[in-house]
UniProtKB/Swiss-Prot annotation:
One of its GO terms (molecular function) is ferrochelatase activity. It comes from Streptococcus pneumoniae serotype 2 (strain D39 / NCTC 7466). Transmembrane segments: none annotated. The keyword Cytoplasm applies. The gene is cpfC. This is Coproporphyrin III ferrochelatase. The lineage of its organism: Bacteria, Bacillati, Bacillota, Bacilli, Lactobacillales.
Length: 364
């Protein structure tokens, strides 16, 4: 039986031009082109950081994993929102005769909002898939963060006052309402690293970053809001974007530009440990998580009738959403129902999955 590993990431613009960024942004918005001012802002951010190394770094990570596991698995790489796209790579895998595939998403934590979005592309009548849901507890990855933060504390902070700010990509607040494990995983991940460092609860905190302006509330506190709200600052802030593993715009701009600029304004020293990128400890974590999971059940992913963002649910789904107060239905869903009428509301795919997980909706 021919087996493969499919390493997947979010993607990035294929070229840093206005239209290159527009194409990428349009893919993120599921084919709806953002307004020009939104594209211009994102384009300017890419220009500010000199482009993005994400694709280069990810391909290097793939090569390093292949060097360790290539005798047993064919290793492929795909992006969610840029070339090579996941469906195209799956097509190539089918042509290569692959029958089983371990899906290794290069995001350590599981979220309904993000990771589930990869699963909808896993359509093949030939290939059975095994999706590794999360791998943030891998000891090698925890050691990486602890070691790199410890270097900053020893070499740069020394005896000065400091605070470690663990940040993670925010998610819409309805993810919390419906029991998304992501938030708890981020807190646990931060605590595990802090314990390795011997940090007290006063020496570190959790914040969120990189939320999108799509008209719905996101998990707080935002890292920039957190900084502005502090009445007193330590001598040093150490920013640890723990939900990411590679340098890309949400680290190089959101942290290294926006957080840095605020630190300059407040007279605080800014620090950020290097991202794992191609470090051997990250590769150890990726290889080990494959080993730990490779004997689990593979299954066929059939195409969903609904997509991640466009779902016309059954009347039962709509009724449950409208009538179950204990689900803490997000305000934007209530407003949609009030404005359009229950029969006309399109619910996000992930809300249906959250309802199933909460036992409020039987799996079909």
């Amino acid at each position: 039986m021919k087996k493969a590993i499919l390493m997947m990431t979010f993607g990035s613009p294929e070229e840093i031009t206005f239209e290159g960024v527009a194409d990428f942004f349009t893919n993120i918005r599921r084919g709806v082109r953002p307004q020009d001012h939104e594209i211009q802002t994102l384009y300017d951010n890419y220009v500010r950081i000199g482009g993005t190394p994400l694709q280069k770094i990810t391909r290097q990570e793939v090569t390093l994993v292949e060097a360790r596991l290539g005798n047993e698995y064919s290793v492929y790489f795909a992006n969610k929102f840029s070339s090579p796209f996941i469906p195209d790579v799956i097509g190539q895998m089918e042509a290569d005769g692959i029958e089983q595939c371990i899906c290794l998403i290069l995001e350590p934590h599981y979220s309904f909002y993000s990771v589930m979005g990869y699963e909808k592309f896993l359509e093949s009548k030939q290939i059975q898939f095994l999706v590794i849901k999360d791998w943030y507890q891998e000891e090698a990855l925890l050691n990486y963060w602890a070691d790199e933060i410890a270097k900053i504390l020893k070499e740069e902070v020394k005896q000065d006052s400091f605070k470690v700010i663990f940040s993670a990509h925010s998610v819409p607040i309805f993810a919390l309402d419906f029991g998304d494990p992501y938030i708890d995983q981020i807190f646990e991940n931060s605590k595990l690293v802090a314990e390795k460092l011997g940090l007290s609860s006063e020496q570190y905190t959790n914040t969120w970053q990189s939320e999108s302006d799509i008209g719905i509330p996101w998990i707080k506190p935002d890292v920039l809001e957190y900084l502005r709200e502090q009445t007193e600052h330590p001598d040093h802030y150490i920013f640890v974007p723990i939900s990411f593993i590679s340098e890309h715009i949400e680290v190089l701009f959101d942290n290294d530009v926006e957080c840095y600029d605020l630190c300059q304004e407040f007279g605080v020293n800014y620090h950020r440990p290097p991202m794992p990128n191609t470090d051997s400890r990250l590769i150890d974590a990726l290889v080990n998580t494959v080993r730990v999971n490779e004997n689990q059940e593979f299954k066929e992913f059939l195409p969903e009738e609904e997509t991640f963002d466009e779902l016309v649910p059954s009347d039962e789904t709509k009724n449950i959403l409208a009538e179950s107060e204990d689900l803490q239905m997000p305000e934007f869903v209530k407003k949609l129902i009030e404005k359009k009428g229950r029969e006309n509301v399109k619910m996000p795919y992930l809300i249906k999955k959250m309802l199933e997980k909460a036992g409020k909706l039987p799996k079909e």
